[in-house]
Amino acid sequence: MLFQNKYMAITVNDINNGVMIQITGEVDLSISPDIKDKILEQIDFNKKEHNFSISKSIYADLSEVSYIDSSGIASLIQSHQQAAKSGVNFYLFKTSPGVLKVIKLARLDSIFKLV
């Protein structure tokens, strides 16, 4: 467990082809910067460890996110952009119905890789 408060938690686990960042709870302005920081840390780690030669994937597991606001969406967009610049695949994994609805309303489902 990397970060936890009474409303949410962030965990990071290595998987075969990359890293799974599981986000649980509510994602709002109070926590969005922490989420972005954890994702960017993994992007930077991937760059340093693999010297740009092997690109691992980062999966943001949003299956247990009960709420997301515009700051949370902005953090995901910034993470997606930084991953693309770094040659790292960034996926939104198992988005919860509420999060998926927000992503589709904002027409971001054509930008994010949803798995």
Regions found by a protein language model. Give the residues of each.
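Amphipathic alpha-helical interaction surfaces in cytosolic regulatory modules
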Residues: 29-111
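STAS-typified acidic loop motif
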Residues: 11-40
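Short acidic-hydrophobic, aromatic-tinged amphipathic segments that line or gate anion-handling sites
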Residues: 113-115
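Intrinsically disordered, low-complexity regions enriched for glutamine and histidine
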Residues: 2-5, 20, 78
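Non-catalytic signal-transmission and effector/linker regions of two-component phosphorelay proteins
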Residues: 1-14
